[in-house]
Amino acid sequence: MVEFTVPEVDYTRYTNRQLAAVPLAVLAVALLVIGGWYVATGAPVNPGVDFTGGTELRIATDAPQSEVAAAFDSQPESIRSVAADGTYVVTFQSGSATSTELQTQAEDAGFEVRSIDAVSANFGGETQLLALGGLAVAFAGMSVLVFAMFRSFVPSIAVVLSAFSDIVIPVALMNLFGIELSLGTVAALLMLIGYSVDSDILLNNHVLRRSGDFYESTARAMRTGVTMTLTSIAAMIVMTIMATLFGIQLLAAIGTVLVFGLTADLMNTYMLNVTLLRWYKFEGVTR
């Protein structure tokens, strides 16, 4: 049986500025990507059919992708091949055509329509407001709870800043990798709030509330926290691969966003959060 051990990091070799520079630089780049995307497209991240409205067809055919696109009067928004069962998932934006018209065009071309899902533009807009509102409320509630737990500004802001970065970085990567904002990716962002707070509170509790010096407490927290996060990343990678092979776009998107966020969480927790806690323990408390 293979044994996994988390290597200890000698934090004494690095200054607070050196440790904080990398996560803050990555956060700044992520914010620039999101800001640039907003200027270019009018939205910080591309919304999917769940929020803009549209129609999604799953068709079975041996035809090439170009022939699938040519079978419809309206230009498809996207065409994804599902190799596992020989189907295509064809997506149309709202207003392109009715679901009945698209189904008729697909059948006239000799394609077998396995399933068809349609979302109206009005319903999609309302769903987007509810989903993003829920994300904002969840983040605000998490922030209030963290401040109530620690009742000290620096440890609390360390957790909140790490959680904020854990959400912003995946959103920027969603833009770069062409992943649209959907109900699935919003759910993944909500899960990231929980993952982030979990590892950050674990670190804060070991450093602030348990015996031992700062570096011993940090090492103990890392043994548990890093193992937990790497296990989650491995599970999400497997889920993403399997979901992609079988054409389950929702699970593939959730898994990809979670891998982005959990990887960012390792950096933010054990570089940025550790930096703020070390400053608080050795400099902030004495002031």
Curated annotation (Swiss-Prot):
Disruption phenotype: A double secD and secF deletion grows very poorly on solid medium at 45 degrees Celsius, confers a severe cold-sensitive growth phenotype (30 degrees Celsius), as well as having defects in Sec-dependent protein translocation. Has no effects on Sec-independent Tat substrate protein export.
GO cellular component annotations of the record: plasma membrane
Intervals, Cytoplasmic compartment: 1-18, 151-152, 198-225, 275-287
InterPro entries per record: SecD/SecF_arch_bac, SecD/SecF_CS, SecD/SecF_export, SecD_SecF_C, SecF_arc
One GO BP: protein targeting
Swiss-Prot/TrEMBL keywords: Cell membrane, Membrane, Protein transport, Translocation, Transmembrane, Transmembrane helix, Transport
Superkingdom, natural source: Archaea
Side Extracellular, residues: 40-129, 174-176, 249-251
Topology relative to the membrane: Multi-pass membrane protein
Signal sequence segment: none
Annotated TM spans: 19-39, 130-150, 153-173, 177-197, 226-248, 252-274
The protein's assembly and partners: Part of the protein translocation apparatus. Forms complexes with SecD.
Name of the protein: Protein-export membrane protein SecF
Gene name tied to this protein: secF
